Structure formats: structure tokens, C-alpha cells
Amino acid sequence: MTIEIKNLNKNYNNILAVKNINFTINKGSITGLLGPNGCGKTTTIGMMLGLIKPSSGTVFINNQNIENENNRTKILEKMNFISPYVELPKKLTVEENLKVYGKMYGVNNLQNKISNLMK
């Protein structure tokens, strides 16, 4: 799955939350958005998932504009993201958390996938 963000902007009234973001996430990559509080990470992810309507700009997933409801529903069934609001158990390691959530969501070949991620 390839995600392409073109000229993405989001305004809340007169406040500019996201300004002219452009990037591509290629199939098979694992990507994170990093930055200080309030810089627009969560807003950007919300727009990528079609949960927040951009003020301008476009999100394409596999060359399909997610503004189209049918495209968005089909595409988002195949996407995953880890919310910044999920509270992970503090006593578990990263690997243990991946196992817990992988089992919860029925991930196939879980141990192999975790091993690859932990390299």
C-alpha cells in the first residue's frame, strides 16, 4: 500500500494546524511521525485516515483519493496505525506489547513478524 500526501493543509477557524505537507509512504514501510506537542501529527494522521477533512490538499492511497467514501472504506480496512492515546501496559516490553496486541487482533505469523520488526 502506498500513501501519498499532496499539499495537505488544515485550518481550525483562523488557526493553521497543518501547513502544506507533502510526503510519500511506500508499500511495506513502517513510518512514524515525530515532533513536539501541537505540531499537527495527530491531525495529519486523522486526515490520512479520512477521519478529519483537510482544508485543502489530497490524500491518495494506492493512487485512490480517500475523499471518495467507497475508496476510503475499502482502503482503511487494510490499514493499521497505533494511536498516540493508547495506554500500553508499562510493565511489558515492546516485544511483549506486540505479542499481546497481535494475538488480540489475530495477526498471522505473529512471532516471525515481531522478530523482523525487532531487528
Predicted features and spans:
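Short coil-to-beta microelement around the adenine-binding A-loop and adjacent beta1/P-loop entry
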Residues: 15-16, 73
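Conserved ABC transporter NBD signature motif
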Residues: 25, 57-68, 74-75
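Short hydrophobic beta-strand immediately N-terminal to the Walker A/P-loop
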Residues: 31-33, 45
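Walker A (P-loop) phosphate-binding loop of ABC-type ATPase nucleotide-binding domains
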Residues: 36-40
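Helix-to-loop junction immediately C-terminal to a conserved catalytic motif
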Residues: 49
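Conserved ABC ATPase "signature" region
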Residues: 99, 103-119
